[in-house]
Every structure is written in structure tokens, then in C-alpha cells.
Regions:
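Conserved glycine-rich cofactor-binding loop
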Residues: 11-12
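The beta1-alpha1 cofactor-binding region of Rossmann-like NAD(H)/NADP(H)-dependent oxidoreductases
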Residues: 46-56, 88
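Conserved NAD(P)H cofactor-binding loop of Rossmann-fold oxidoreductase domains
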Residues: 74-79
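Substrate-binding pocket helix/loop in short-chain dehydrogenase/reductase
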Residues: 82-83, 90-92
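Active-site helix of classical SDR
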Residues: 106, 141
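Residue(s) in the substrate-gating loop at a strand-loop-helix junction
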Residues: 125
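C-terminal helical subdomain
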Residues: 158, 164-165, 184-225
């Protein structure tokens, strides 16, 4: 039983697939997203770039559900382009959502996770371990998530489970708003988000004291790994 699982970005992509998987496993998805999720799941709208909004959303959902058993930080945005071409506000928003938003959500959830002996799954990227040009904001944010999560795992050892998920490209709407030159080609091998969500459920399903520390889940021909 996975219990009450708070999922950021749960209205689309990997977050939505994870929410569906949690519900199918008998758990209760609790969604934080700017958009409204389908499926009738409990949700609070919040901009993760705003720390107070993020923290308030976590507390509201946790209190509504009577606690938290896990957190999955699946929300993420991008800003493709050369550093000098991407407006500074847009560049910094990627850091704010992907990295600072992750930290804000986990921080707010920790009192509940300490009580339940729960788990955290952060979502980084293969671009968090291998850098590419025209992706400075995204790489900086996801390299940050990798470092944050590894430090968090050391900090919370024996108290709260921590898993770092490093997914490759997935067939979601994440790429839709990019210029064509930054979109995967028509023959690109991308994972289905449902397959990555099943890996998250595997990590969440481990018994207390047994942890999946890191998971790399990507297509066998993923160009950003290794």
C-alpha cells in the first residue's frame, strides 16, 4: 500500500502517469500543479516558483489527507537556447521551479514524512548527469536536483527514504512548445511515462529500511546516457 502520495506536476506527463499508477495501486494521489488534473484527484493549484505557494499547497493537501506517506517531485519546465539568447527571467524561472520548487516541497513535507517514515522520490534527468549545449538552465536545475537529493539521502538516512530518479526523454507534452530544432525527431526512441511511473511505484513499494537510492530509466538508445 503506497498510501498518501503528494505529486508535483501531477496534471500532465510523468506526474499524471504517476498519479494514475498510485491510484491503481490503492493509494491516494495528492496533486500540486498550476493546471487541474483529470481523474478527480485531490489537488491544489500552486506555482512552484513561489515558495510560499508551494509550502501552503503541501500543508493543505497533507492536512486534508491526514498525513503523507510519500512525495514525488515530477514538476519541471525548460528554456531552450543559448545562454545569451534566453531572457534572464525565463532562465531563472527554470531554476526556481525545477530546483528551488523541489526543495520547497520536500522541506514542507518533511514533518509529515518523519511521522510516517515515508519516502521522497525526486525527478532529475539524464541531463542532470550529462550536459548539453543550449540547455544551460535545465542542466543547471537538474544537476542541482541530483546534488540536492544525494545530500538529502545522507541527511535523512534511517529516517525518511530518498530515491533519485534519472529519467531519459519521455513521450509527453514536455517538448511541444519548443522550437522544432529542439524537439525530438520523428524517429526518436522515447519512453512512455507510464513505464517510468512504474519504476517510481517500485521505489515507493519497498519495505521500510530498504531503499532504492538511484534509478536511471531511459530508452535503450537514449543519446543523453551514458
Amino acid at each position: 500500500m503506497v498510501g498518501n502520495v503528494l505529486i508535483t506536476g501531477g496534471a500532465s506527463g510523468l506526474g499524471r502517469a504517476t498519479a494514475t499508477a498510485v491510484a491503481k495501486a490503492g493509494g491516494r494521489p495528492l496533486i500540486v500543479d498550476l493546471g487541474e488534473p483529470d481523474g478527480g484527484f485531490d489537488h491544489v493549484r500552486a506555482d512552484l516558483a513561489d515558495r510560499e505557494q508551494a509550502e501552503r499547497a503541501v500543508r493543505e493537501l497533507a492536512e486534508r489527507a491526514g498525513g503523507l506517506d510519500a512525495v514525488v517531485t515530477a514538476a519541471g519546465i525548460d528554456a531552450c537556447g543559448r545562454l545569451e539568447d534566453v531572457p534572464a527571467d525565463r532562465w531563472e524561472r527554470v531554476i526556481a521551479v525545477n530546483l528551488l520548487g523541489t526543495a520547497a516541497v520536500v522541506r514542507a513535507a518533511l514533518p509529515y514524512l518523519h511521522r510516517s517514515g515515508g519516502k521522497v522520490v525526486t525527478v532529475a534527468s539524464t541531463l542532470g548527469v550529462r550536459a548539453f549545449g543550449d540547455a544551460t538552465a535545465y542542466c543547471a536545475s537538474k544537476f542541482g536536483v541530483v546534488g540536492f537529493t544525494r545530500a538529502l539521502a545522507a541527511e535523512l538516512a534511517g529516517q525518511v527514504g530518498v530515491t533519485l530518479l534519472i529519467p531519459g526523454g519521455m513521450r509527453t507534452a514536455f517538448f511541444d512548445d519548443r522550437p522544432d530544432r529542439y524537439k525530438p525527431g520523428p524517429d526518436a526512441r522515447l519512453n512512455q511515462p507510464e513505464d517510468v511511473a512504474s519504476a517510481i511505484l517500485f521505489a515507493l513499494g519497498q519495505p521500510r529500511g530498504c531503499e532504492v537510492r538511484e534509478l536511471v530509466v531511459c530508452a535503450s538508445t537514449e543519446t543523453s546516457w551514458p
